[in-house]
A protein has these predicted regions:
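Conserved N-terminal diphosphate/IPP-binding helix and adjacent helical/loop segment
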Residues: 1-118, 122, 126-141, 177, ...
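A non-catalytic, amphipathic alpha-helix used as a structural packing/dimerization or gating element
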Residues: 44-47, 51, 174, 206-213, ...
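Amphipathic alpha-helical segments within well-ordered protein domains
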Residues: 72, 160, 220, 281, ...
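Residue-level signal for inorganic ion chemistry
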Residues: 86, 159, 185, 280, ...
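Inter-helical turn/loop segments and adjacent helix faces that build the functional surface
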Residues: 93-102, 162-174, 189-206, 220-236, ...
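Active-site alpha-helical segments that house and flank conserved acidic catalytic motifs
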Residues: 105-130, 180-181, 212-216, 220-223, ...
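Divalent-cation-assisted or electrostatically stabilized phosphate/pyrophosphate-binding catalytic cores
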Residues: 133-155, 196-211, 234-238, 260-286, ...
Length: 371
């Protein structure tokens, strides 16, 4: 039902939080001081990353000029290139892949997962109506929604082409399965928007589908191309799963506590769009009157549907402030640490050395990153 008075931020008093509900902190295994330097962690695979970058930036000379420009801007905007880096590192765990004919297939895999990731971002921006990403205008800000979707489709096609270049049917099937999983996750997210009584399991299913599945494709696909034993292929799949789950959890934490300028969006952007993430679930679990929080949000959303978006924004702003002041963020970060400890454990059966150390260092980087 409609509410008669605007819902102000103070509707979420911090005194209602249970101050005793703080999790025990599980620290990651200490790493050398340089382990958090991503450039140092990528050093063993730098030549391979350059090859991936060259492949990503290749533009068909016959391509429609505006699409070619958009393609160059999307790929040229860079990013951490974590997905291809994980593929390259995983492929080298058994030693001696660089310089072999099979290494070109690993390069193609790395380009494939990165291009697939980029394509999903383009479509996400259309679905969310986002005009900015990391503070820069999205393709959606310049083109119509239809044109942007078509551009994303082109990227999907390019990713599929790269996958085919591996000439490995198991990897090609993995690419197809991953794409289907991503779409399933996107549909789940759309269905659960503004559903404030959904289960936390919905969140885990969603972030596996939209994020972790791509990391799984990178590490499992690389293990297949490296011809590792099935047990080790399974280990690297699990590594990708645990790494990817933690990566998205930290992303969702940063959405609440990160610097607006660095992230290029206001705090609580996911919640403002009706997407519930792990910090919110912990906030709700720790709140002594969770039902009142849900009632406030549901009423504010009704007001927004009736044209009064200010009520919704005020409600979310108040919740974000209260969430930051409590222990929900640390509880979510603890879950990320647990996933990353599992990821490190997944590497125990693989040869020790530079590549494994880089994978372990990336786990430490993920839990501490601020962007």
């Amino acid at each position: 039902m409609l509410i008669s008075q605007p819902i102000m931020p103070q509707s979420f008093p911090s005194k209602l939080m249970d101050a005793t509900a703080r999790p025990n902190v599980v620290e990651m295994t200490p790493q050398p001081s340089g382990a958090l330097d991503v450039n140092a962690l990528f050093a063993p695979i730098r030549p391979g990353l350059r090859q991936v970058e060259a492949k990503l930036c290749g533009v068909d000379s016959a391509l429609f000029a505006p699409l070619a420009d958009a393609f160059i801007n999307l790929i040229g905007s860079g990013g951490k290139r974590l997905r291809p880096a994980l593929a390259l590192l995983a492929a080298e765990l058994n030693g001696g892949m660089q310089g072999t004919p099979r290494y070109s297939a690993v390069i193609a895999l790395g380009a494939s997962v990165e291009m697939l990731h980029t394509a999903t971002l383009v479509h996400d921006d259309v679905i969310d109506g986002s005009l900015l990403r990391r503070g820069a205008p999205t393709l959606n800000a310049h083109w119509s929604g239809v044109s942007t979707v078509l551009a994303g489709n082109y990227l999907f096609g390019t990713a599929a082409r790269f996958s085919a270049e591996t000439q490995n049917m198991r990897v090609i099937e993995l690419f197809s399965d991953t794409l289907r999983t991503i779409v399933d996750g996107e549909l789940r997210q759309l269905k659960d928007r503004y559903n404030f009584v959904q289960k936390k399991d919905n969140y885990y299913q969603r972030i596996y589908a939209k994020t972790a599945s791509l990391f799984c494709a990178a590490t499992q696909g690389a293990a297949v191309l490296a011809r590792l034993p099935e047990e080790r292929i399974a280990d690297l799949y699990q590594f990708g799963y645990n790494f990817g789950m933690a990566f998205q959890i930290v992303d969702d934490i940063l959405d609440f506590v990160g610097d607006d300028t660095t992230l290029g969006k206001p705090a609580g952007s996911d919640l403002r769009q009706g997407t519930l993430t792990l910090p919110f679930f912990h906030y709700l679990h720790q709140h002594v009157d969770a039902s009142s929080v849900i009632a406030i949000l549901e009423a504010a959303q009704i007001e927004a549907d009736n044209g009064d978006g200010a009520v919704w924004n005020e409600a979310v702003t108040g919740l974000v402030q209260d969430l930051r002041a409590g222990s929900a963020v640390e509880a979510a970060r603890e879950e990320a640490r647990i996933f990353l400890r599992r990821a490190v454990d997944n590497l125990a059966g693989l040869p020790d050395g530079l590549y494994r150390h880089s994978l372990q260092g990336l786990c430490e980087f993920v839990v501490r990153r601020t962007y």
